[in-house]
C-alpha cells in the first residue's frame, strides 16, 4: 500500500471510510478545553471541512488544558490559532472560522445547509440549549458535551442520549 498521511486510518476504516471523512463537513462550536481536542482528532482523522466557532482569545489559564494554548499563542484569536494548527497537520482541510459569541439568534445564520455534523463544546447553557434545539428541528446530527470541569472521578463520566434522563441538570 502506498504510504500517505492517513495510511494508518485507512487500514482501520478502508478507502471508503477515508473518503467519507474527507467529504464530511463538521462544525465545532467552542474550541476550548473540549473543542480544541475534538478539532485535533477530526483533523488527524482526515475530515475534509471544519467550521470553527468561538469568540474567545487564548489566555494564560488555557495553558493547562487547551491544545492550541502556548505562550506564543496567548492573546491570539482561538479559531485562528486552531486554523493554523489544522493546516499544519492537514494542508488539504478546508477551514472556515467564525469569531462570534453564539446566541439563539445567530445560530441559523452560522450553520450551513450542507453541514454533516455539529459538535457542541460551548459553555453557555442558553446557547447550548438553543443549538441542540435548532439541530434537532433541522435533523442535523449533533454531539453535545455537557462538561466535566471540576470533576475528579472519571468513573462517573457518562455517554448517553440527551433525551434520556442521566442525572445532569444541564441535560434536562
Indicate residue ranges for each PLM-predicted region.
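Glycine-rich phosphate-binding loop and adjoining beta1-alpha1-beta2 segment
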Residues: 47, 52-90
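Aromatic pocket-lining residues of Rossmann-like dinucleotide-binding sites
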Residues: 42
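ADP-ribose/adenylate-binding Rossmann-like module
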Residues: 117-160
Amino acid at each position: 500500500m502506498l504510504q500517505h498521511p492517513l495510511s494508518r486510518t485507512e487500514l482501520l476504516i478502508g478507502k471508503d471510510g477515508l473518503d467519507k471523512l474527507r467529504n464530511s463537513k463538521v462544525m465545532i462550536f467552542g474550541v476550548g478545553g473540549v473543542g480544541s481536542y475534538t478539532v485535533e482528532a477530526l483533523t488527524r482523522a482526515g475530515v475534509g471541512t471544519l467550521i470553527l466557532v468561538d469568540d474567545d482569545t487564548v489566555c494564560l489559564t488555557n495553558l493547562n488544558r487547551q491544545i492550541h494554548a502556548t505562550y506564543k499563542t496567548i492573546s491570539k484569536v482561538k479559531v485562528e490559532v486552531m486554523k493554523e494548527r489544522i493546516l499544519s497537520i492537514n494542508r488539504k482541510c478546508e477551514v472556515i472560522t467564525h469569531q462570534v459569541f453564539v446566541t439563539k439568534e445567530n445560530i441559523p445564520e452560522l450553520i450551513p445547509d450542507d453541514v454533516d455534523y455539529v459538535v457542541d463544546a460551548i459553555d453557555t447553557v442558553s446557547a447550548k440549549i438553543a443549538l441542540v434545539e435548532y439541530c434537532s428541528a433541522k435533523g442535523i446530527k449533533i454531539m453535545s458535551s455537557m462538561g466535566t470541569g471540576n470533576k475528579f472521578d472519571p468513573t462517573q463520566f457518562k455517554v448517553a442520549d440527551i433525551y434520556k434522563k442521566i442525572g445532569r441538570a444541564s441535560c434536562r
